A protein has these predicted regions:
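Substrate-binding N-lobe of the ribokinase-like
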Residues: 30-38, 44-45, 67, 71-138
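Active-site metal-binding loops of divalent metal-dependent hydrolases
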Residues: 52, 185, 297
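Conserved phosphate/ATP/ADP-binding segment of small-molecule kinases
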Residues: 187-278
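Short acidic, glycine-rich surface-loop motifs adjacent to enzyme active sites
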Residues: 177-189
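Conserved post-catalytic alpha-helical subdomain immediately downstream of the catalytic base
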Residues: 259-260, 284-341
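Compositionally biased, low-complexity flexible segments
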Residues: 5-27
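Conserved phosphate-binding/catalytic loop of the ribokinase/pfkB sugar-kinase fold
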Residues: 128-134, 139-176
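Positively charged, low-complexity intrinsically disordered leader regions
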Residues: 2, 23-63
Length: 341
């Protein structure tokens, strides 16, 4: 981890062991997986920057209502932590067989050290700035009978020194990667996103963005932006038909100078807009169990396939397949190259 000037922290713990450590794991597969470009993906170097989180799950049984208030009582039987936000994007990049590097901000706390430890275990090179003035962003979910009953969020906006440290890390790493992925969850790590995109452009590294908010001007100069249906409506308003969507999408793409704009549309599939026009694929999910983290998987798949040299339409088809797989899993999950067959 990168510790901010003047900070004291626990060295040698799980977080310290992960600093700058790790490398791609599980990339020694021979041949291709029924068309998935395993060899090319193994050479892909993907840098993920953005809002790093820890997703914490408490699983238990519900067999009574509390006498104190009309709420269920969960008898917790198991706890599980998973990488979330930008860290989940990096986890998916590594699971697909590419070389994943993660830059972000964590707190000087147990969740932050666990993020670093989980990243190392996943084969991710984690370069994390430590901000002792804020907690690591943590989303805690309580589940009973495989259903989510409650979510509790712990989060604060990072300070300027932490953002300065993030800039230093990004500057050092961008040029040695094939693609930069920006995972924006509006938690503050990408407050200076315009400058980050400009640095990547100067280095000749394409930028893929999972956006937040309704002002997409801050993403001007990226190669690809991937809003979901709701986010696209925030940005351009509701559309009455496919023709109106295409008109507004192409106008937005032109205003931002994007190579491509991909709208993910849940059960309606995905629609890609480029200079060549409109391309669409239908959704592939057979059963939707949990959509949390699905956008992370889609973004990671787009990044590794694009870095491997695939054209946008083909990258979209692989991303659609990955998204259809991951929504059938509980919680923030990954898709591997083997599952893409």
């Amino acid at each position: 981890m990168t510790r901010l000037p003047g900070e004291q922290g626990a060295a040698g713990g799980p977080g310290g062991a992960a600093a700058g450590a790790g490398g791609p794991q599980g990339r020694a597969q021979a041949g291709e997986v029924l068309g998935f470009p395993v060899r090319a993906v193994a050479r892909a170097r993907v840098l993920v920057a953005g809002d790093v989180m820890l997703d914490r799950y408490w699983f238990g049984e519900v067999d009574r209502i509390s006498p104190e208030a009309p709420v269920p009582v969960v008898r917790v039987a198991r706890r599980e932590d998973r990488l979330g936000g930008a860290a989940n994007v990096a986890r998916n990049v590594a699971a697909l067989g590419a070389q994943a590097t993660l830059v972000g901000i964590v707190g000087d706390d147990e969740p932050g050290r666990h993020v670093a430890e989980l990243a190392r275990e996943a084969g991710i090179r984690a370069e994390l700035a430590v901000d002792a003035g804020r907690p690591t962003t943590l989303k805690m979910r309580v589940l009973g009978r495989q259903q989510q009953l409650l979510r509790v969020d712990f989060e604060e906006t990072p300070g300027e020194p932490a953002l300065d440290a993030l800039d230093v890390l990004s500057d050092r790493l961008i040029a040695s990667h094939d693609v930069l992925v920006l995972s924006d969850y509006a938690k503050g790590a990408l407050k200076r996103v315009e400058a980050l995109i400009e640095r990547a452009r100067r280095a000749g590294v394409p930028v893929l963005v999972d956006p937040k908010g309704d002002d997409y001007r801050r993403y001007r100069g990226a190669a690809l932006v991937t809003p979901n249906r709701s986010e696209m409506q925030q940005a351009v308003g509701r559309w009455s038909d496919e023709g109106q969507l295409a008109e507004r999408a192409q106008r937005l793409r032109g205003e931002l100078g994007l190579e491509a704009l991909l709208v993910t549309r849940s059960e309606q599939g995905m629609t890609l807009f480029t200079d060549a026009g409109r391309d669409h694929v239908d959704a592939q999910a057979h059963e939707v169990f949990d959509v949390s983290g699905a956008g992370d998987t889609v973004l990671a798949t787009l990044a590794v396939t694009r870095a491997a040299g695939l054209a946008w339409p083909e990258a979209m088809r692989w991303a659609n397949r990955a998204g259809g797989i991951v929504v059938g899993k509980l919680g923030t999950s990954i898709v591997t190259a083997g599952e893409m067959s």
